């Protein structure tokens, strides 16, 4: 499936129906009064978050979404039919902005969460509304009001508890395929992963945790270099970052610092997110020339985060690393619950 994480669309709510001018014409009411009904309300445009969508691909092919107009008023004080609301389904994790002002309109993170994004126009008034002691036969009515019209920018931020980050070719796709049933494209060259891959990793309890393999970041990603700028936003919703570092690199410390600097430059508290570090590809390291334990100690001193020696290919060290992930997630969940009840 092609991954589309941004889209620009136009939405327009329905116009309110027009009020009408009408008079009672019953046989035994020779001086019938006004009976023109009001117009119906225009339909609204409502966004609904659903679980079975993972991309904004549908919005690439359809850019304009319009709800139905309200019906005209009728005689005998009948109000026109309301226009049908237009329901637009979006993936959970969709953030909606006004494309012209940049204002945040909504953030749909939960299944079935709804947001009225454009309200339908109010129906116009029929002439019966204008009946008064001074005017017993008003011959005018009001048209319905237009519905709201907006130009929107949609952004999809993945809903994953654990974000796997690192430079290109750190082994992120291999790791997520080893941990879960996900089968991302894997090859030995940079930027193999062009879209974020999701995998569900099972805890010993059987509960699933969503991991996201974030495409490789490079120096300058926060300023738009490489693939990073478009994908850094996906890290925003994660609770824990699993920072993967290639143990076969010529300079492991430099690689670590490169990613940390990009997280700090991007802001939004990403550099303060709880992290676990993993030196990957230890099966390919010459232990006689590389002291992995010393590198792990250096990284621990730099990051103040736990460091694990792993191989995603041979699955060496994955279980202890996962136990640390589960423990940190439990801490984060406990802190969030404490904040809710405090």
From Swiss-Prot:
Gene Ontology cellular-component annotations: cytoplasm
Q: For GTP, which residues are the binding ones?
A: 166-173, 191-195, 213-216, 280-283, 311-313
The record's principal subcellular location, in a coarse class, is cytoplasm
**Quick one: which residues bind Mg(2+)?**
173, 193
Report the InterPro entries cross-referenced here: G_OBG, GTP-bd, GTP-bd_Obg/CgtA, GTP1-OBG_CS, GTP1_OBG_dom, GTP1_OBG_dom_sf, OBG_GTPase, P-loop_NTPase
**What Enzyme Commission number does this protein have?**
3.6.5.-
Role description: An essential GTPase which binds GTP, GDP and possibly (p)ppGpp with moderate affinity, with high nucleotide exchange rates and a fairly low GTP hydrolysis rate. Plays a role in control of the cell cycle, stress response, ribosome biogenesis and in those bacteria that undergo differentiation, in morphogenesis control.
Q: Which HAMAP family match?
A: GTPase_Obg (MF_01454)
What family classification does the UniProt entry report for this protein?
Answer: Belongs to the TRAFAC class OBG-HflX-like GTPase superfamily. OBG GTPase family.
Under PANTHER family, the record lists: DEVELOPMENTALLY REGULATED GTP-BINDING PROTEIN-RELATED, MITOCHONDRIAL RIBOSOME-ASSOCIATED GTPASE 2
| This protein's name | GTPase Obg
Protein source organism:
Nostoc sp. (strain PCC 7120 / SAG 25.82 / UTEX 2576)
